[in-house]
Amino acid sequence: MEARDIILRPIVTEQSMAEMDNRKYTFEVALHATKPQVRKAVEEIFGVKVVNVNIANVRGKKKRQGRYEGMTRRRRKALIALSADSKEIKIFADEDNDKK
């Protein structure tokens, strides 16, 4: 399995943005991904040293559209802590490069 298939997208919330100052990043990962696979994928993609990986399964929520009821899809998110000597992950592109 490719590293890009394991790490799907960053999760951008107020809480996850605040944790970035402490070198903790939150990503949505594949449903079948394990902690060692997530660690290896992050180290391979971003070139950083991972200290800890925590994973949480998020249940789908019930949603209604008129009289029809359905479920949102379930997700799996990983909270990744980096070592103090590793570089930070650039999730957003620099605005200076976009303006050129």
Swiss-Prot record:
SUPFAM superfamilies reported in the protein's UniProt record: Ribosomal proteins S24e, L23 and L15e
Keyword rRNA-binding set for record: yes
Alphabetical keyword list: Ribonucleoprotein, Ribosomal protein, RNA-binding, rRNA-binding
Organism superkingdom: Bacteria
Gene Ontology cellular-component terms listed: ribonucleoprotein complex; ribosome
GO BP field: translation
Leader peptide range in chain numbering: none
Recorded family membership: Belongs to the universal ribosomal protein uL23 family.
Function: One of the early assembly proteins it binds 23S rRNA. One of the proteins that surrounds the polypeptide exit tunnel on the outside of the ribosome. Forms the main docking site for trigger factor binding to the ribosome.
Known partners and oligomeric status: Part of the 50S ribosomal subunit. Contacts protein L29, and trigger factor when it is bound to the ribosome.
UniProt-recorded name of the protein: Large ribosomal subunit protein uL23
Gene: rplW
